[in-house]
Amino acid sequence: MRKIIHVDMDCFYAAVEMRDNPALRDIPIAIGGSRERRGVISTANYPARKFGVRSAMPTGMALKLCPHLTLLPGRFEAYKEASQHIREIFSRYTSRIEPLSLDEAYLDVTDSTYCHGSATLIAQEIRQTIFNELQLTASAGIAPVKFLAKIASDLNKPNGQYVITPADVPEFLKTLPLGKIPGVGKVSAARLETMGLRTCEDVQKYDLAMLLKRFGKFGRVLWERSQGIDERDVNNERLRKSIGVERTLAEDIHEWAECEAIIERLYPELERRLAKVKPDLLIARQGVKLKFNDFQLTTQEHVWPRLSKDDLITTARKTWNERRGGRGVRLVGLHVTLLDPQLERQLLLGL
């Protein structure tokens, strides 16, 4: 049985700012956006969250909820430096590390001899070491598989940890809402609910053949996760090459204004996901995806140096006008391709 730890730093960017400027500790602060009400919030500290300020929220809305919110532009190099230090701490306990972004990672400590092989004690020691050396807090989840470790890391935040032992898994899954499973978004969860599927236990009792017929590959993954199955290894070589968001629509759309409204709703989530990996929002390309009611899929992208909503809307409109051919649209997606790390270093050196 494997021992997987998911470590998630607590409001990481904001925590770095508060550490480096103690005057910010007790006031509501957020990273991202500006007083001109442009952009979205990348992260907010806990005083700001008490007012309802959240990641991916438009800055204008955040300022309405918390007019005295202090907005900070973000310091990518400071976050990157802290992240590298945290990664080095992980490496003291295991070589099997899969970073997901600057502020979270999976660790496989199955074969680790530290702390007598106890994943719970290893997670505790890692969190304490991070605090001692960086004055930053982290939360952790410990479980026999990756997706449960990720869910567990969110159950005792901030500055805590939660353990799901192999013996705990069946009981834990019984009442776990499907929307808590990584990869099951709000739209999918709502669609599943119309089928009477709200928890993992509901899916356990559902016919797998029907799930495969309705959802294809996603149906298989959903069924496996509901059984506690996740055979994915902690991947040391993982290098994220792209980030995307998409929405499958309950009904086909036929008007451009409807498509544009969906893009407006999707964009903040794309910006939030990109900011977790690339706070400076530098990219190689960005593009759009449309799926028509005959199930034909089309994508269009082009080279663009920085994430831009206006450019994505322009690209989407061009795709809509040139490729739709009167068909209804049932899926809208946005994506970016990340810069190759070597090319990025060369570009930065040339600035």
From Swiss-Prot:
Task: Name its species.
Answer: Citrobacter koseri (strain ATCC BAA-895 / CDC 4225-83 / SGSC4696)
**What family does this chain come from, according to its entry?**
Belongs to the DNA polymerase type-Y family.
**Which protein is depicted?**
DNA polymerase IV
* Enzyme Commission numbers on file: 2.7.7.7
Q: What does the record give under GO molecular function?
A: damaged DNA binding; DNA-directed DNA polymerase activity; magnesium ion binding
- Which GO BP annotation is one of this protein's? DNA-templated DNA replication
Q: What does this protein do?
A: Poorly processive, error-prone DNA polymerase involved in untargeted mutagenesis. Copies undamaged DNA at stalled replication forks, which arise in vivo from mismatched or misaligned primer ends. These misaligned primers can be extended by PolIV. Exhibits no 3'-5' exonuclease (proofreading) activity. May be involved in translesional synthesis, in conjunction with the beta clamp from PolIII.
Record domain UmuC: where:
4-185
Q: How is the cofactor bound?
A: Binds 2 magnesium ions per subunit.
Which residues make up the binding site for Mg(2+)? 8, 103
Name the site position(s) for Substrate discrimination: 13
Q: What CDD domains would the database entry show?
A: PolY_Pol_IV_kappa
Q: Which GO terms describe its cellular component?
A: cytosol
| Cofactor needs | Mg(2+)
Q: Where in the cell is it found?
A: Cytoplasm
Q: How does it assemble?
A: Monomer.
Q: Which UniProt keywords apply?
A: Cytoplasm, DNA damage, DNA repair, DNA replication, DNA-binding, DNA-directed DNA polymerase, Magnesium, Metal-binding, Mutator protein, Nucleotidyltransferase, Transferase
PROSITE patterns according to UniProt: UMUC
